[in-house]
A protein has these predicted regions:
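N-terminal basic, low-complexity leaders that serve as flexible interaction/assembly modules and, when applicable
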Residues: 72-143, 431-438
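Flexible C-terminal active-site loop/helix
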Residues: 74-90, 101-105, 353, 369-438
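Conserved, mostly hydrophobic/aromatic
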Residues: 75, 117, 141, 180, ...
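Metal- or metallocofactor-binding catalytic centers and their adjacent structured scaffolds
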Residues: 113-191
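N-terminal small/glycine-rich loop or linker at the start of catalytic domains
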Residues: 167, 192-216, 251, 256-258
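Active-site mouth loops of central-metabolism enzymes
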Residues: 208-221, 265-270, 314
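Catalytic core of soluble alpha/beta enzymes
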Residues: 240, 245-373
Length: 438
């Protein structure tokens, strides 16, 4: 075997082989050839012989550690975990933000483990103790990825979508694929010893401005109290889920100019009704008007509301793919795009949507009614995208947060994690205490 070479700096390089570099294998030699550092083609390297094994640098927890060039990682184990976490939101329970009222928030996790023992976490969009979705993932999705190379993120995503597209392009199956995609990105970051935002191109900020996404209270008193609590906690952006005009006006008045207000009404009206209500609210200077018309895929109808010119229109949390956003933007339906990482194909799909939005001058503000890995992935993606001004956080309090204090906003802002991968691990207490035996 050819001995290690030295380049002009005198540093020893690893053994080389032809082919493109893959990120992820901690057994791969660290130091890339000098042309890789200067922007040239990066060559993958094979592990050195035993005599040189002591020179391998393994990933460290710090964000500034050296990148490890990855050869391959095999998915050895995969399982789902369903949690039901009680929460409080003020007022009279149960609470809603447009759907069925509830006292607890369900989180469907996927846990992937490689043959090297690395663990990656993902999250599927889930509501109402979704045992059916868990079983779908356990029986249809996870068996298809066992033994696959975890560094082949796009390839795995495409193969799953192609094999299972008859189940629908916006469905529980797609939510499960999104969860797997998030977990694969977590694995990649951990294998490289790098935070996810760095793999996405670097962060524009180390913390994000958060908007408090309030529950739908349905009465003025509870809503005004919740609005004031959000202001007291330092939030300067507040989203309402109310559909009553009296409630909306009362909350805007309670803000007294201290916070910008947007409303998310969850598609309750016909297009003519949405046009009329948009006109009723035109004096409130709303930050945006979200999903005013039914059905959510009626992009031409949504475009009519936008063409009225009274409010900026936001939508996208019910879209399933890049092509849905292409149709939305082509119809002139939105000012703000809101894909959900746990619904719309994971990080891989949202990266494409972000580029599409940037090319068309549409704001990219991901939807995030999530408290698991989907929430953390959205933090990283938002930090890495220049045109994302704010980050969504549902305004409620848990007995135990899945990530402890790390994802609780302070004075209306949230820190971007700096550890490898997602940078955070679920708190064992939460996994044990709130896990459903299904």
């Amino acid at each position: 075997m050819r001995p290690p070479q030295r380049h002009s700096s005198g540093r020893r390089t690893g053994f080389r082989r032809s082919g493109a570099a893959l990120l992820g294998d901690p057994l791969c030699y660290v130091s890339p050839p000098p042309q890789a550092l200067d922007g040239g083609a990066v060559r993958a390297v094979t592990p050195p012989p035993p005599a040189y094994r002591k020179r391998i640098k393994k990933p460290r927890a710090e964000a500034d550690c050296e990148i490890n060039w990855v050869v391959a990682m095999k998915i050895a184990n995969a399982k789902t975990i369903l949690l039901s976490m009680p929460f409080e939101a003020g007022g009279t329970p149960p609470w809603s933000f447009g759907g069925k009222p509830a006292n607890s928030f369900d989180i469907l996790l996927v846990r992937l483990e490689t043959n090297d023992g690395l663990v990656g976490w993902g999250e599927a969009f889930s509501r109402g103790r979704d045992i059916a979705l868990k079983q779908t993932m356990d029986t249809r999705l996870l068996p298809l990825i066992l033994g696959r190379d975890a560094t082949q993120i796009s390839k795995i995503k495409h193969s799953l979508e192609f094999q299972l597209h008859n189940f629908g392009r916006i469905s529980g199956v797609e939510y499960g694929i999104a969860a797997i995609d998030i977990a694969l990105w977590d694995l990649l970051g951990k294998a490289c010893g790098q935070p996810l935002y760095r793999l996405l191109g670097g962060a524009y900020a180390d913390e994000l401005e958060v908007y408090a996404s309030l529950m739908r209270y349905g009465n003025v008193d509870d809503l005004v109290k919740a609005t004031r609590r959000a202001l007291d906690r330092g939030y300067r952006y507040i989203k309402l889920h109310e559909i009553g005009l009296d409630e909306i006006r009362a909350a805007v008045k309670a803000c007294a100019g201290k916070a910008k207000v947007m409303i998310d009404v969850n598609c309750p009206w016909t297009v003519p009704e949405a046009l009329a209500i948009a006109k009723e609210l035109q004096d409130l200077d709303l930050y945006w008007f979200e999903e005013p018309a039914w059905p959510p895929e009626n992009y031409l109808g949504l475009a009519r509301v936008r063409q009225q010119g009274l409010h900026r229109i936001a939508a996208g949390k019910n879209a399933g793919s890049l092509h849905d956003f292409m149709s939305m933007i082509s119809a002139g339906a939105i000012d703000i795009a809101q894909p959900d990482v746990a619904k719309t194909g994971g990080l891989t799909e949202l990266l494409k949507i972000a580029a599409l939005c940037e090319a068309h001058g549409v704001e990219f503000v991901p939807h995030c009614a999530l408290f698991g890995p989907g929430q953390v992935a959205t933090i990283h993606l938002s930090a890495a995208h220049r045109s994302t001004p704010i980050f969504e956080r549902l305004f409620c309090d848990f007995e135990v947060e899945l990530y402890g204090d790390a994802t609780i906003p302070k004075n209306g802002k949230i820190k971007v994690p700096t550890g490898p991968g997602l940078g955070l691990e679920p708190v064992p207490e939460a996994l044990e205490k709130f896990r459903l035996s299904v």
